[in-house]
């Protein structure tokens, strides 16, 4: 409704990663202070157990168009030609996934190290859901192939080690940076209500 009906704002790529992972990737970054002038314990979760995969989200009336738990966490990737979803169940198991979305090559990383914000009442005691990243595997016009080996993400050509932020931290390609794709981490019910045409990755 209004003069700008049909327009869409440009999405800026972002990630959900732990503070340790953020600090390692961006040591000089500014961090918002917890001293906001309001009493708030940012380490507590008022919705303990909300993201239990066997739960049903409150206020959801629609049935999901896919045979998937509404509370399953998914990585949603959208291009102009295709919308695709990847469940955490699969990405945590595989750690690295190469695929195409709308004809564009992507690589998904999933590593341990970030606690769920909606599991335990005290967030630092919550289960480790891990952090994700979705990137273009093309670097300087060369298509790299990645694997999870020895607890690290490496590219097969040079053996360089890559972080969850898509930066090479060691090896011949050290300090090289992959381009982040537009994606997000969502509950399945939240993503699929807006994008019911999503093709779910099943390999």
Each language-model region and where it sits:
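Mid-to-C-terminal functional-domain signal that highlights helix-capping/loop sites
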Residues: 1-203
């Amino acid at each position: 409704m209004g003069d700008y009906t049909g327009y869409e704002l440009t999405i800026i790529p972002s990630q959900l990663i732990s503070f340790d992972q953020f600090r390692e990737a961006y040591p000089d970054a500014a961090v918002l202070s917890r001293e906001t002038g309001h009493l708030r314990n940012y380490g507590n979760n008022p919705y303990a157990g909300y993201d239990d995969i066997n739960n049903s989200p409150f206020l959801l009336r629609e049935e999901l168009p896919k045979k998937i738990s509404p509370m399953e966490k998914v990585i949603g990737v959208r291009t102009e030609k295709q919308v695709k979803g990847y469940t955490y169940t699969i990405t945590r198991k595989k750690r690295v996934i190469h695929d195409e979305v709308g004809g564009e090559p992507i690589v998904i990383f999933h590593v341990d190290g970030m606690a769920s914000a909606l599991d335990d009442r005290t967030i630092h005691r919550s289960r480790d859901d891990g952090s994700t990243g979705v990137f273009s595997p093309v670097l300087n016009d060369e298509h790299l192939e990645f694997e999870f080996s020895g607890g690290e993400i490496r590219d097969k050509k040079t053996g360089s080690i890559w972080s969850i932020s898509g930066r090479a931290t060691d090896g011949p390609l050290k300090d090289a940076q992959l381009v982040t794709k537009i994606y997000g981490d969502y509950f399945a019910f939240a993503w699929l209500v807006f994008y019911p045409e999503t093709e779910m990755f099943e390999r």
